[in-house]
Amino acid sequence: MAVNYLQYIGFVQQGGVTFPNVRFLVSGVDSKVRQIVGQNIVSSAYDRGKTLFVVDNTQSYNAMQTGFGRYQVVNALNGEVSLCNDLLNVNSLKSISRLRSLLSDLGFDGTRAMKIVTYLNFVKETQCRLGDSTALTIDILEQYGSMILVEWKLKQLVETGSLSEENYRYLMGRYSEVSGAASDFETFLVLLSPFLGNTQPTPSMAVHLPVGEFASDKPMQEMLSKLLISYIKQNISNATVLILDDGNGEDRKFIIDILKNIPVSSEVHMLSNDAFTLGEADRSILMNVFPIRIYTRHENMTSCGRIECLCGQIDVVKHSSTVTIDKRFRANSAWDMLLGTNRTETSIANAPTKEYRFRKEIINTMYDGTGIIDYAGNKVMFSF
């Protein structure tokens, strides 16, 4: 009976293979192998009740030819799902730390980040004084978008006796201190608005993050990756991340950011047309993040050469032989010719020489459905 790639990996592991314990990297243009591995990843995640996050670094939704099975696919950019609906709640050190971390990743320094936290607390406190204790939303923050609006709200509290003139002046002073940061934050919220909805990701949902559509807008790609990392850190056991990569360009910083910052215990996989077009430092990160690597046919000979080196060398012993024939008349009697005693055969085993296990020419011309499985120090050619 033929052995499939999961059985082989399980054998190498000396135990049954399960997706939570491994991370897969598939690199190459072979759509058959990519589809087989991708569908197994998707099916396993669905059966275990995981929300699937698809980081799609391609120019086309169908470019990677990976089906999503029974998952309901939703586009995160359409506001169909919330990745940070509690981002505006700064009522605990943990939530404040999360917001500060996200703001720092997006270019806000520590002082400005704390002014934004102070601003959100100011809005929350004022809303509570007005009798509204619900969670903060973008709509509520818009009501505090200018000095005139804030002054009007606080005057209401003074008129109803809920706020003294002294506290009124104090709060207006506080607002003037943080209003500059508040203005910057509101601009930032315009980008965040699609991810601040009320619909939480569910186990039957595949959240599509089309980062490839923002190839010319690197900050937008980085913001999407930061939001994803922030969400995964809060929901490690409930999510699977699948990165689809077209393999174009040496600088794919947002992918490396995800791989470097995502929790070690989280589940992440990557299917790429060519992961070896990344720079040397980034390739080193890939090798560390993904213990199971599958290399299929690559069109870029430079990438083929890198895989050739990665798979290492083996000792090859080459044999040579010579035949010396005695053409003297006396050595060519019928008996000599019949018994072969008119010739001398010499076989020589040369000293071992180093050769690449898989030459780049082979990697460049591999058959469809064939790949090299690189796992636990073993590198074998495998038919899928």
Task: Enumerate the predicted regions with their spans.
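Structural recognition of the beta-strand scaffold that forms the well-ordered cores
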Residues: 269-270, 295
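P-loop NTPase motor core of the ASCE superfamily
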Residues: 108-114, 279-384
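Conserved H-loop
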Residues: 270-278
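P-loop NTPase motor domains
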Residues: 2-266, 281-282, 288, 363-366, ...
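Residue-level detector of flexible, active-site-proximal loop/helix-junction positions
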Residues: 78-80, 275, 300
